[in-house]
Every structure is written in C-alpha cells, then in structure tokens.
Amino acid sequence: MTELARLKFYATQPHSCSYLPEEQATTLFLDPSQPMDVHVYADLSEMGFRRSGDHLYRPHCQNCNACVPARIPVAQFNPNRQQKRIFKRNVDLQVRPVKPAFSEEYFDLYQRYIEQRHADGDMYPPSRDQFSTFLVRDLPFSRFYEFRLDGRLLAVAVTDLLPNGLSAVYTFYEPQEERRSLGRYAILWQIAEAQRLGLEAVYLGYWIKNCKKMNYKTQYRPIELLINQRWVVLN
C-alpha cells in the first residue's frame, strides 16, 4: 500500500443526488494538486474511489450509504447462459485499444447514446466540452477500447489499467444496435481482458440497490461489494 495517510482530501458542499433525487449528496475528492499516480489510484480503488476526468472521488454522504462500490473478481467469474450468448453474438467485432483523444466520430456516438439512453440524466444535453472533460484525459493508464464492425464504430469502453485490475470508467455505444447488448458485452470483454492480463478484478463503480439503472451490475457473478471497509461477496 502507498502512504495514503499523507494524502489530502476535500469534501464538497451537499448537493442534489443524481441517483436518488430525495437525497443530498456529498463527495470526497483527492486533492487535485496531487499527481495522478497509478499506484495511489489502485490503492484508492480498493477503498471505493473512482475516477472522473482528472479527479479521484467517492461518495461521502452524511445520511446515506446507498452507493456501494462493486467489483468482479475475474478469476472466479462464471458467465451465465445469457452472457455466453451475448459474447457469441459479438464475436465478429474487432477491439482495439487507443490513447484517449477527441474526435467527431467518438462524440457523435457519445451524443447519440446520451440523447437516446440518458436524456433524463445530468449528462444531458451532451456537449463536446463535457465529453472531453469527462473522458479525454492525457493519462498513461487510460485507454479507449474501440469496438468496431468492419470499420464502423459501435462502442467505446473507457478503461483504466491499474496494477490491481481494470477500472471501467464509462462505456458509450450505438443505441440502435439493441440486439447486440453492447453495454453488457463491453463488461464481459473487460472481464476477459483482465483475465488475460492476470489482473484481479474489474471495478464497476457504485451499485445502488434501489436504483434500477444499477441493477445490471449484479448480473455478473460473483460480485464483491465494499461493506464496512471490507470486500464481501454478494449472495
């Protein structure tokens, strides 16, 4: 473990929660002046932190603990029948890792995805500045995994390569390709990639029991949740 005790953290003022509208949220951020070190990031991921743009953060709410960090221990992952079908359905896709960058091709796909899948969320309406600030960061451990079919871009999985696993930062995909279940496939592919690289886990961010948009995360078993500062398997 790195010497986390020397790091500084700052808490935001309470603000409206984007997942549970009736709640007020507070977020704990690593000091922005702290260099984005991959080993610090890995240690903080074990403590439930995530990356958004140039910031590492985790929920720090006074009256709510609904946001539970979730990860998949990839060595024990056992795909179910539906997941095997999804993997087989997308075997014709070509996957390529590239350095994060802005392009109109990426933004057009991101824009269609947000407008058709998340028009009720706080990322709507999408903008080029929002896309760049959120996802296009010059970090040596960050990748855009492109999923293409005969050159056509169908999905991008923004992923951080950490010493202890892959952190699934964000995935956006072609909303018209519903049959392919591209969001689910991107997670399955990242699990397989983590296995290939000999890594321990894929970090999925936060799971919220009463948030329907989060339900998909518990379809990957086994899944571990960070509860009382310990990773435990969800039964």
UniProtKB/Swiss-Prot annotation:
Coiled-coil region list: none
GO biological process terms, semicolon-separated: ubiquitin-dependent protein catabolic process via the N-end rule pathway
Catalytic function, reaction form: N-terminal L-glutamyl-[protein] + L-leucyl-tRNA(Leu) = N-terminal L-leucyl-L-glutamyl-[protein] + tRNA(Leu) + H(+); N-terminal L-aspartyl-[protein] + L-leucyl-tRNA(Leu) = N-terminal L-leucyl-L-aspartyl-[protein] + tRNA(Leu) + H(+)
Keyword Acyltransferase among UniProt keywords: yes
A single cellular component GO annotation: cytoplasm
Known function: Functions in the N-end rule pathway of protein degradation where it conjugates Leu from its aminoacyl-tRNA to the N-termini of proteins containing an N-terminal aspartate or glutamate.
The family this protein is said to belong to: Belongs to the R-transferase family. Bpt subfamily.
Listed PANTHER family: ARGININE-TRNA-PROTEIN TRANSFERASE 1, ARGINYL-TRNA--PROTEIN TRANSFERASE 1
Protein name, as recorded: Aspartate/glutamate leucyltransferase
Species of provenance: Pseudomonas fluorescens (strain Pf0-1)
Lineage: Bacteria, Pseudomonadati, Pseudomonadota, Gammaproteobacteria, Pseudomonadales
